[in-house]
Amino acid sequence: MDIISVMNDKALKGTKKRAAIIELIVSGNLNCEQIEAISTEINDKQMASILEAIEEISNKGLSQLSSRYLLFAIPYIKSENNNCRREASRIVGNMAAQYPDMIEEAISPLLDNSSNEGTIIRWAAAYALSRIITTDRYAQSELYDKLTDISNKEEDNAIRNQYLKALKKASKVRK
């Protein structure tokens, strides 16, 4: 089964569709170039399913994903679709330590999302930014002060705690 068949299969719902996409990627039957090629042919909900599959692979280490997946996900941080924004942010967070030199362009939209009125979008931004700040490259940067300010203003404890834990970790690198 190819990605278009999976996307158009009405019998596959939610987690089964994600599992089918994961299997295609992990088995080598679907690569990032093929995903990029169909990205203009599918709707936001379908793209969110693909991003969700990539996020699960990157989170659980099911397969070694190339930096191309990271670069593919970054523009979706600014998507109109909140599911795409959330999953793209999580992909960046999951892959930040692996590709710290390739996440620069993700930081600005993540900072924008950190002040979004939606809790899920702010949480996803905090997830990614908290993993970025713990990399050697960013622990010593001005991002540290920005995240300190954001954490001081954040009212949601779960989101604030993500920042505080990461800032504590990053402060050890700063010494």
Enumerate the language-model features and the residues they cover:
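N-terminal alpha-helical scaffold/docking segments in eukaryotic complex subunits
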Residues: 1-48, 60, 168-171
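Eukaryotic acidic, Ser/Thr-rich intrinsically disordered low-complexity regions
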Residues: 2-4, 144-175
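Alpha-solenoid HEAT/Armadillo-like helical repeat scaffolds in large eukaryotic proteins
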Residues: 6-9, 34-42, 69-80, 106-117, ...
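Alpha-helix N-cap/helix-start positions at coil->helix boundaries
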Residues: 12-15, 44-45, 82-83, 117-120, ...
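Structural signature of alpha-helical solenoid repeat scaffolds
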Residues: 55-58, 93-94, 130-131, 167-168
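Helix-adjacent hinge/juxtasegments
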Residues: 63-104
